[in-house]
A protein has these predicted regions:
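Conserved AdoMet/S-adenosylmethionine-binding subsite of the radical SAM
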Residues: 51-221, 225
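Non-transmembrane, interaction-prone segments in cytosolic or luminal domains
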Residues: 4-16, 138-140, 146-149, 196, ...
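Acidic carboxylate-rich catalytic motifs and surrounding loops in phosphoryl-/glycosyl-chemistry enzymes
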Residues: 108-110, 170, 228-243
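Residues in flexible loops and secondary-structure boundaries
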Residues: 17-19, 25, 33, 80, ...
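N-terminal [4Fe-4S]-dependent radical SAM core
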Residues: 1-18, 22-69
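Generic detector of bulky aromatic hydrophobic side chains
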Residues: 6, 146, 162-164, 218-219, ...
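Generic preference for hydrophobic/aromatic residues in regular secondary structure cores
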Residues: 1, 44-48, 116, 231-233, ...
Length: 243
């Protein structure tokens, strides 16, 4: 059971992540704080939890009637870019969960495989996109998949009738990266849901004059766009703060 505000149950079957996000990455900060990893370089060498499928076989019968949706993943990436071993395991986890009549959601900065469209349940397939800029991606998500490749894989699943969503989080302030939010929204117009959230744990955010009003304005743009295009949405806590 996860404490993440839009989550239900979660499965994290890998320790670490080779995407090496530098926003900074909240999962890395927590793992380092509690002594699970020594440093950034260790975090970049992900390790599969070897008994994942055995644990899944034991846990699914216990929890399947309680689970509304099982999320992969909040502290790692289920379709880690250029890691076919992790991708294969994630697909098998999804197949077994669906076989137990448990719906799943996934969130990745990798490439969503087309095989996901063959799964029997109405799963929810998502990608993170906080900018359309490859230069920004290379600086802040150095090991992740190129932005357009992510979006194309999501659009292919959408074209095949799958439920798709995008997480625009953590969205940077203009002093970190200046961009056109509407352009980003229009590029992902085909999705069923958008989640929008501010950037935390980066002091540059508070150095931007009027940062809260900036996030308020961005959140309102997301809400307006979603309502105009019949897209469901969720604005993360502490992103939109009305006076």
């Amino acid at each position: 059971k996860t404490g993440v505000e839009y989550g239900d149950y979660t499965l994290n079957h890998v320790e670490g992540c080779s995407h090496g996000c530098k926003y900074p990455c909240y999962a890395f900060l927590m793992k380092k704080r509690f002594g699970k990893v020594k440093d950034y370089s260790e975090w970049l060498e992900p390790c599969i939890v070897e008994n994942t499928l055995d644990l899944l076989g034991k846990e699914l019968p216990k929890y399947r009637n309680k689970i509304n949706i099982l999320h992969l993943c909040f502290t790692t990436d289920p379709f880690m870019y250029k890691r076919p071993d992790i991708q294969t395991l994630s697909l098998e986890v999804l197949r077994r969960a669906n076989a137990a009549n448990v719906r799943c959601s996934v969130l990745t900065k990798g490439i969503l495989p087309t095989e996901l469209a063959e799964l029997p349940l109405r799963n929810e397939y998502g990608i993170t996109v906080v900018s359309l800029s490859e230069a920004f991606r290379e600086e802040y998500e150095p090991g992740a998949a190129p932005i357009q490749d992510r979006i194309n894989s999501l659009q292919e699943l959408s074209n095949q009738g799958c439920y798709t969503w995008v997480s625009i989080e953590p969205f940077p302030t203009p002093n970190i990266h200046e961009q056109n939010l509407l352009e980003l929204l229009q590029r992902i117009h085909f999705v069923d849901k958008i989640i929008f959230g501010r950037l935390h744990y980066n002091k540059a955010v508070s150095q931007f004059n009027g940062y809260q009003e900036f996030y308020n304005e961005c959140a309102r743009k997301v809400i307006h766009f979603c309502e105009q295009n019949n897209i469901s949405y969720h604005i993360k806590e502490k992103t939109l703060i009305e006076k």
